[in-house]
Amino acid sequence: MENKGVITQIIGPVVDVTFENELPRIYNALKIDRGNGEYLVAEVQQHLGNSVVRAVAMDATDGLQRGMEVVDTGPAITVPVGKAVLGRILNVLGEPVDEAGEVKAEEYAPIHREAPAFEDQGTEKEVFETGIKVVDLLAPYVKGGKIGLFGGAGVGKTVLIMELINNIAQGHGGLSVFAGVGERTREGRDLYDEMLESGVLDKTSLVYGQMNEPPGARLRVGLTGLTMAENFRDKEGQDVLFFVDNIFRFTQAPSEVSALLGRMPSAVGYQPNLATDMGALQERITSTKTGSITSVQAVYVPADDLTDPAPATTFTHLDATTVLSRRIASLGIYPAVDPLDSTSTALEPQIIGHEHYNTAREVQQILQRYKELQDIIAILGMDELSDEDKVTVNRARKIERFFSQPFHVAEQFTGMDGKYVTVKETIRGFKEIIEGKHDDLPEQAFLYVGTIDEAIAKARELMKGAE
């Protein structure tokens, strides 16, 4: 027999329900009939006493009234998983929002589950080849790791995310799940259209909880996407890419309902269980013995304050950071990754090997020296530099340009064929530049090419054109 209750109080997205017979468990999904054939789903958060539970609605509470009937569905929110969700846009409840018919899934899974047990986790640190030179050389990603993508508006976060999705699909045959948490609806639509055009949509599942949706949806949509990714990892044995844009909104949503749930606010008005919420999501993103989930998370930094509790809590979980810089974007170098600001825990000789490590460190030293010399160059010009510094500056400028790379997903905008560069080729190219083997080549030859051989071929063409 169904366990039924009655709404006794509604405050914004928070609904109190009285159950006379049996109280639903914490995180159970409650169904409320709006009376027009539509149902509202709410998730139990607290037991208040006197047979009352407090729940957070996953959709707008407009039109609800006290006295309306509520049904305890039994389990937590369950969403479709498996191959059926590929190529689809779903909402927090796993319902399709792309007008392409119902999702014919053979399996459903609850969005709340424990992180993999300690003995099930993979312990080897394995580098994840992205095919993007600047990332693979200086801030390599770890399989089953978490990567923070920091960048302002218009510096290329979305294009970088799309290229990663493309390279995983083409290069590794892997699957991706994209969770748009508190996304602009327009950006979500753009991403869908671009994926459709570039042909990576059938290897991707999109889960959106947009900015205009109530906090309940933004609070749980990350877990919905993660549940789908976990299924690909555990049942299909896949190496999955899990994108979250934006992880900050995942911490912002509970802070909106925290006071309504009767919790005392903590620092800067955030919810007191901020670290617990974040840990529950992040600890599920890991490698197991069957497969891995590698997560790329766009991080919005409120007022550029990295000590704000939301980004600070995110930092503790990250294995690598990829920082996009407006200065580099303004030079026309894309991807606009800042080579000196981006970091990775995998940049260790015992993980990536001595050749890769030494090349990366030398590249950073040259770029750091170039940065120090820029004031002198701006005031006095190149002629005032020592011969040694002139060589360093020339090599640094070539390295900067060699970091640029044509992307597959931007082919229709740039007119250039996208390039996937293996780690081996990347190391060889930068090593040759550092060793001075290409000091005679013009800077332009290094702009928007793949391997060093392409740069040499481009230099020959430039020289022919000059003649």
From Swiss-Prot:
Transmembrane segments: none annotated. It comes from the Bacteria. InterPro entries: AAA+_ATPase, ATP-synt_VA_C, ATP_synth_F1_bsu, ATPase_a/bsu_AS, ATPase_alpha/beta_chains, ATPase_F1/V1/A1_a/bsu_N, ATPase_F1/V1/A1_a/bsu_N_sf, ATPase_F1/V1/A1_a/bsu_nucl-bd. Its EC number is 7.2.2.1. It is a peripheral membrane protein. It catalyses: 4 Na(+)(in) + ATP + H2O = 4 Na(+)(out) + ADP + phosphate + H(+). It is an enzyme of class 7 (translocase). ATP binds at G151, G152, A153, G154, V155, G156, K157, T158. GO terms for molecular function: ATP binding; ATP hydrolysis activity; proton-transporting ATP synthase activity, rotational mechanism; sodium-transporting ATPase activity, rotational mechanism. The keyword Amino-acid biosynthesis does not apply. Coiled coil: none annotated. SUPFAM superfamilies: C-terminal domain of alpha and beta subunits of F1 ATP synthase, N-terminal domain of alpha and beta subunits of F1 ATP synthase, P-loop containing nucleoside triphosphate hydrolases. It is found in: Cell membrane. Produces ATP from ADP in the presence of a sodium ion gradient across the membrane. The beta chain is the catalytic subunit. HAMAP family: ATP_synth_beta_bact (MF_01347). NCBIfam families: atpD. Belongs to the ATPase alpha/beta chains family. F-type ATPases have 2 components, CF(1) - the catalytic core - and CF(0) - the membrane proton channel. CF(1) has five subunits: alpha(3), beta(3), gamma(1), delta(1), epsilon(1). CF(0) has three main subunits: a, b and c. PANTHER family: ATP SYNTHASE, ATP SYNTHASE SUBUNIT BETA, MITOCHONDRIAL. The ATPase of P.modestum is of special interest because it uses sodium ions instead of protons as the physiological coupling ion. This is ATP synthase subunit beta, sodium ion specific. It comes from Propionigenium modestum.
